[in-house]
């Protein structure tokens, strides 16, 4: 990120996680390393759905984001999904550039002592903004409102959606 945005002093990332093993620990570790290297971090207070991470990146004007999740893989796994400033997962050419930089870094190059002044916890207000944006994106709200017998079933399936829309 530092090399992708040279000369910028206002770099920021959004960091989130899901409900997988050690998700919070890994998200905090990611936040600590970014902050130790001079990058502001918006860290979600608890687990959040992946689309909200993407939304927050754009809403906050962050240059990147990380979601600690293994996505559709078995629950025993965890992973690291990287996002760019458009809120989308990193694609070419950025993915190749990132891997190239990873290959150049040694453990001695990484700063680990967090700068807690650069870590901001986010949550409730972003949830409201996200849910409002989802509602506004509905194709035709009037059609939905006219459905007298409309029933909707929602299940977060024990996932991250349970935080912003409890079942």
Language-model-detected regions and their locations in the chain:
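Conserved oxyanion/phosphate-binding beta-strand-loop segments in alpha/beta enzyme cores
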Residues: 1
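Gly/Ser/Thr-enriched, mixed-charge loops and adjacent short helices
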Residues: 4, 78-167
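Ferredoxin-reductase
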Residues: 6-85
């Amino acid at each position: 990120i530092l090399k992708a945005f040279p000369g910028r002093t206002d770099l920021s990332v959004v960091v989130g996680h899901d409900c997988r093993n050690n998700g919070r620990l890994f998200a905090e570790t990611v936040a600590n390393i970014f902050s130790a290297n001079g990058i502001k971090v918006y860290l979600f207070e608890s687990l959040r759905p992946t689309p909200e991470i993407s939304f927050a990146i754009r809403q906050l004007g962050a240059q990147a984001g990380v979601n600690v999740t293994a996505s559709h893989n078995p629950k025993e796994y965890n992973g690291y999904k990287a996002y760019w400033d458009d809120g989308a997962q990193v694609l070419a050419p950025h993915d190749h550039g990132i891997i190239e930089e990873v290959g150049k870094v040694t453990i001695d190059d990484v700063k680990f002592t967090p700068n807690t002044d650069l870590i901001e916890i986010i949550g409730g207000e972003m949830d409201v903004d996200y849910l409002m944006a989802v509602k506004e994106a509905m194709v035709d709200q009037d059609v939905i409102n006219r459905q007298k017998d409309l029933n909707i079933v929602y299940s977060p399936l024990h996932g991250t959606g349970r935080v912003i829309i409890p079942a």
